[in-house]
């Protein structure tokens, strides 16, 4: 039989539910009916029943132990919370008193200022003075507290403002040196206040560190005790041997008048071991007396059980727990069968509903898909029509653009020919002008000579010159008609060519327009053909899809038929299984009626119970022996604890007597300023203040997410471990 062990020392969270720490009272396989076994003389059933009863008793003991442990945890948490609540109430009362004192002190200060100023100054016409000195409250979290302070602040501000206005008006002009000195005085006063605040904070931290130092010393002492407890068994055996040797040596040394114990410095240890041995002996006497009393009671119970065993009737068998348990199991089986039948019917109805829903859902899905495909096809047709319209417009625009480009090119060629003819004319004109210029100097020379020396020339020379001039004149007259004729011919040819080029350009423009129209008609025909081909493809695709849908529907129909046949087979199998279950239930009822008449099985159960009692007795003896050993060890540890506590008190008094102010300051500096018991090991990133990890976790768990020193908000991510 499993023995309930003591709770382990592994740390576990405080918010553990009872269901998480309980073991299931039954296995997961208990839902199904148990498999049938043939009972041979009733032995197997009795063994199973006894094992079940043992497990149930063990589970009840385990649950009771778990409930008791959880109750102790709740008690400890309750004490801790009550202690914290008392501390919070004390701090709240202190802060309330502090605020009241500040309020009345401010009112008294303003009254004293009024008396001083009214006695020293006369009533003067006040001038408006800038009230830049009025301070504002930098507190964002509490609107009600802010309104409260504003209500208190208004009368104080009015009084102080009136006093400052009087002082400023009576003061007159202020020199810059005086203003500078006043600013220095203000800065010095502010520094003084900051230093005073720092001193107060350091004093508070010093006090917290001293408390943390005390708690740390206690923890060290506890750790030393635990270390002593964790000594091995071999060390304890060696200590017992040393104790036995020391007792023998002590007796011999006392007879001889020597004090070897004092010389070796082990007298105190031997005394403690002697006290431990005395305590163990006393405890053993008490245990022996308790064991004798238990033996007497057990003998009386054994005699009574023997008497009951000899005279057992059938009614007694019927009243036994085993018979009741077997009857309860039989009733549970019948209930399970009925429940399974009801659940089976419900499952069938649910399956039929789900099938109907599936068919309706498939039909709706197919309808939606068909509607969606038709909509998409209509949209595609509209888009195709729009595309053809856009393509035709594009082709028309391209044709117009080509015609315009061709006309522009033809105009450019005609203008180029005209320019060439004009250039030829200009060349000819320049040629003729050059000839005229060539001929003019001869005439000028011939004419200039007679003008210069006309009186000197003779008649023959004059006749020669005149004849020459007449010849030149006749030559020129002969050249001019030819020139005119050539010029006219060139002009006619040029005009004709220009007209031919213009006619050709017009013809080319007409041909390009006709070509663009023919291309447009060709492209339109191609587009119509593409549209028809696309429509044919879509119709073929729709035809193939419809054929696929028809084939799918046929496959679904065949699947439904196969499923219906399988379901009918399952229904037949379930009916047959139901019949078999009913027959089995009847057999079980007959077996249960027969079980009431079987006394032999009860005898075997009694033998099993006797064996179980013997095993329990052996287990109980072992537990008692262990308990006796543990109690003896506890007595030894109590003696050691008394000794260690006395030594602890001595060392503590020595430490406190030898401690200096610097040590106290360091102790207060290291201890947490909130709990005064733990060391500072966590720093807040936002403000830089240092506290212990437990205080920070408690504040986060209680949603008090503000620094205790500066009241600045922080989060779990702002907490960082600090190493001193």
Curated annotation (Swiss-Prot):
InterPro entries, alphabetized: E3_ubiquit_lig_Bre1, Znf_RING, Znf_RING/FYVE/PHD, Znf_RING_CS
Zinc finger residue ranges, RING-type: 672-711
Polar residues bias locations: 241-262
Catalytic activity: S-ubiquitinyl-[E2 ubiquitin-conjugating enzyme]-L-cysteine + [acceptor protein]-L-lysine = [E2 ubiquitin-conjugating enzyme]-L-cysteine + N(6)-ubiquitinyl-[acceptor protein]-L-lysine
Enzyme class: transferase
Recorded family membership: Belongs to the BRE1 family.
PANTHER family: E3 UBIQUITIN-PROTEIN LIGASE BRE1, RING FINGER PROTEIN-RELATED
Protein's UniProt name: E3 ubiquitin-protein ligase bre1
Organism: Neurospora crassa (strain ATCC 24698 / 74-OR23-1A / CBS 708.71 / DSM 1257 / FGSC 987)
